[in-house]
């Protein structure tokens, strides 16, 4: 199709869709394909992707399977969590935050292998196409991006399978029928969308949940844990130091056991439509609650409230694919500055779908028991001072009232 494209780096999972894309690139563009498979903690065995790529003629040296779990949590998830980011107040951005890292590595591999373009398997209806491509262009403005779902005429699962069989691409038997929903997973979350979930009135069937037990079936006894923070990032669980990815994985196990982190959500996509998704973020939900807990005693009121005002914009930037944009980096600098004293320990109670902060302590705590006590404060606070404070703040309200407004 294009003489200018000789080699393409494909974000490759080894599944049916990206295997069809791999062959389609070879047939349509007549180009060499380099495959890249990211291990983001999705819990799948990734070596079959290597075997399948080799079966489809990819040179061993052009098959990249990279373990990005630590980088993902350290450089993407934790910075986002410092902001307490939740898109539209609920969504912990598990899919959104993974895309810039995948794009970053795609662009790096393209540079390493001398590729002319990168390709992804995101559809033309969703947000991921935007996230992949905005990130790629931010890192390399001259990169070419191929989005097969916007180019080919394969408009159904049946057509995809027929094309695969025509080109001798192995089709697993469980892929011949329509899947009742589609999923995306990484160390932070699992998302499920489509088919059985498209009616927002219908409750999500139990079989959709893969990462958490039903809260009703969770243990009848609560479990208490502690998370240690240093400068806004988690560093230990129950007193045991852990790397970022190891900590999140351990929290995932706890969250799964106690049915924590389920979210049934109708959200506003960047491309303009509403979509219904079911998210499971067990460890991320625990971590987010804990981070809020340690901030509650270490952040000044003004800083805390300003962070809360900035958070929706920060979350929207990530959701819409602007991780590498200057405005996100500006907000990140402010957020990171706020975390200088966000150090200490949070105790949480895990019980039947809930992660409740029940204790917090910090060497930088701004909480003064002496000032808030209901007992004798030994002169720490003169309650008579409140009268002047109220009088000044009431002045404008009195003036408005006297004008009948």
Swiss-Prot record:
It catalyses: L-citrulline + L-aspartate + ATP = 2-(N(omega)-L-arginino)succinate + AMP + diphosphate + H(+). The keyword Cytoplasm applies. One of its GO terms (cellular component) is cytoplasm. PROSITE patterns: ARGININOSUCCIN_SYN_1, ARGININOSUCCIN_SYN_2. ATP binds at residues 11-19, 38, 121. L-aspartate binds at residues 123, 127-128. Belongs to the argininosuccinate synthase family. Type 1 subfamily. Pathway: Amino-acid biosynthesis; L-arginine biosynthesis; L-arginine from L-ornithine and carbamoyl phosphate: step 2/3. GO terms for biological process: argininosuccinate metabolic process; L-arginine biosynthetic process; urea cycle. GO terms for molecular function: argininosuccinate synthase activity; ATP binding. Homotetramer. Its EC number is 6.3.4.5. It comes from Sphingopyxis alaskensis (strain DSM 13593 / LMG 18877 / RB2256) (Sphingomonas alaskensis). This is Argininosuccinate synthase. Keywords: Amino-acid biosynthesis, Arginine biosynthesis, ATP-binding, Cytoplasm, Ligase, Nucleotide-binding. L-citrulline binds at residues 91, 96, 127, 131, 182, 191, 267, 279. It is found in: Cytoplasm.
């Amino acid at each position: 199709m294009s003489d200018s494209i000789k080699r393409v780096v494909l974000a490759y999972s080894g599944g049916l869709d990206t295997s069809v894309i791999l062959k389609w690139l070879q047939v349509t563009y007549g180009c060499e394909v380099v495959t890249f498979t990211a291990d983001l903690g999705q819990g799948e065995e990734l070596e079959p992707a290597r075997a399948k790529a080799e079966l489809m003629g990819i040179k061993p040296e052009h098959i990249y399977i990279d373990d990005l779990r630590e980088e993902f949590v350290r450089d993407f998830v934790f910075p986002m969590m410092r902001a307490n980011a939740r898109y539209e107040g609920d969504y912990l951005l598990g899919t959104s935050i993974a895309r810039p890292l995948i794009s970053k590595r795609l662009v790096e591999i393209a540079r390493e292998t001398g590729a002319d373009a990168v390709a992804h398997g995101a559809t033309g209806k969703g947000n991921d196409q935007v996230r992949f491509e905005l990130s790629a262009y931010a890192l390399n403005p001259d990169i070419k991006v191929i989005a097969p779902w916007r180019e080919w005429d394969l408009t159904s699962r049946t057509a995809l399978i027929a094309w695969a069989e025509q080109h001798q691409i192995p089709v697993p038997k469980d892929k011949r029928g329509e899947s009742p929903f589609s999923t995306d997973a990484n160390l932070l979350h699992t998302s499920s969308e489509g088919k059985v979930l498209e009616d927002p009135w219908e409750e999500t069937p139990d079989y959709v949940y893969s990462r958490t037990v039903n809260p009703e079936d969770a243990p009848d006894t609560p479990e208490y844990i502690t998370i240690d923070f240093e400068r806004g990032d988690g560093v230990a669980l129950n007193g045991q130091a852990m790397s970022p990815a190891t900590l999140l994985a351990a929290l995932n196990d706890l969250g799964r056991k106690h049915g924590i982190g389920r979210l049934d959500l109708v959200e506003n996509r960047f491309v303009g439509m509403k979509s219904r998704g079911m998210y499971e973020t067990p460890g991320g939900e625990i971590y987010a609650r804990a981070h809020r807990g340690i901030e509650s005693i270490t952040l000044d009121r003004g800083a805390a409230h300003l962070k809360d005002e900035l958070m929706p914009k920060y979350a929207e930037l990530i959701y819409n694919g602007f991780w590498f944009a200057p405005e996100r980096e500006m907000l990140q600098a402010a957020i990171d500055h706020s975390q200088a004293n966000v150090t200490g320990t949070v105790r949480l109670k895990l019980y039947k779908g809930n992660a409740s902060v029940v204790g917090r302590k910090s060497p930088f705590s701004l909480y003064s028991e002496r000032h808030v006590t209901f007992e004798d404060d030994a002169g720490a606070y003169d309650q008579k001072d409140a009268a002047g404070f109220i009088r000044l703040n009431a002045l404008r309200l009195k003036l408005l009232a006297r004008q009948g407004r």
